[in-house]
């Protein structure tokens, strides 16, 4: 087994997870590693016409491959000699754990960016299962939009109760513990 690794970047909305993912991927690219970023095909928040880019909240972008299933990409990743795999919005991929573990066991570096919980502060997807498999876990915070303290939670500001409701500032705010419970 080659020496691969899994690195998890987690935090609430607006904490800079995608920016950190892009920064790490660019760092590997500068060292001539073959890299790819994969995003969920349902994430079209910033450009509905171009699904093959991952965007930060400040509208910086990087080329990406959009998919709803990571496992179907394995043959392409192996054939293309990809060494570093970045995955944005990993909470939306049902096969994130199996994919990340198998790629790391094949010698790939896997960098996963995902929410630390849903809008109710409950586990979101299977990302939490990666924590015990990861070499590193980076937990980011945002700034609470109400009191300007560190914010660890994402609060939905719409009435939709569906767990999967992709959006940005139009649907979510970052809040601290105290402000999560206030109106």
Swiss-Prot record:
EC code: 2.7.1.21
GO molecular function (one): metal ion binding
Catalytic activity of the protein: thymidine + ATP = dTMP + ADP + H(+)
Keywords (A to Z) from UniProt: ATP-binding, DNA synthesis, Kinase, Metal-binding, Nucleotide-binding, Transferase, Zinc
Gene3D superfamilies hit by this protein: 3.30.60.20, P-loop containing nucleotide triphosphate hydrolases
Active site: 89 (proton acceptor)
Classification via SUPFAM superfamilies: Glucocorticoid receptor-like (DNA-binding domain) (SSF57716), P-loop containing nucleoside triphosphate hydrolases (SSF52540)
GO biological process per UniProt: DNA biosynthetic process; thymidine metabolic process
Residues reported in the UniProt entry to bind substrate: 119, 163-167
Binding site for ATP: 11-18
Binding site for Zn(2+): 144, 147, 176, 179
InterPro entries found in the cross-reference section: P-loop_NTPase, Thymidine_kinase, Thymidine_kinase_CS
Tree of life domain: Viruses
Family: Belongs to the thymidine kinase family.
PANTHER family: THYMIDINE KINASE, THYMIDINE KINASE, CYTOSOLIC
The protein, known as: Thymidine kinase
Gene responsible for this protein: TK
């Amino acid at each position: 087994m080659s020496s691969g690794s899994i690195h998890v970047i987690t935090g609430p909305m607006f904490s800079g997870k995608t920016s950190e993912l892009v920064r790490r991927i660019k760092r590997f690219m500068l060292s001539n590693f073959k890299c790819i970023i994969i995003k969920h095909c349902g994430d079209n928040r910033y450009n509905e016409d171009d699904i093959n880019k991952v965007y930060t909240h400040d509208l910086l972008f990087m080329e990406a491959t959009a998919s709803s299933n990571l496992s179907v990409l394995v043959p392409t990743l192996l054939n293309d000699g990809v060494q570093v795999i970045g995955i944005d919005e990993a909470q939306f991929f049902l096969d994130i754990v199996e994919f990340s573990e198998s790629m790391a066991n094949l010698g790939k570096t896997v960098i996963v960016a995902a929410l630390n919980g849903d809008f109710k502060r409950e586990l979101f997807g299977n990302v939490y299962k990666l924590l015990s498999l990861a070499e590193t876990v980076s937990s980011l915070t945002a700034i609470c939009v109400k009191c300007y303290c560190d914010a660890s939670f994402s609060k939905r500001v719409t009435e939709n109760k569906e767990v999967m409701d992709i959006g940005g500032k139009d649907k979510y705010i970052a809040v601290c513990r105290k402000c999560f419970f206030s109106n």
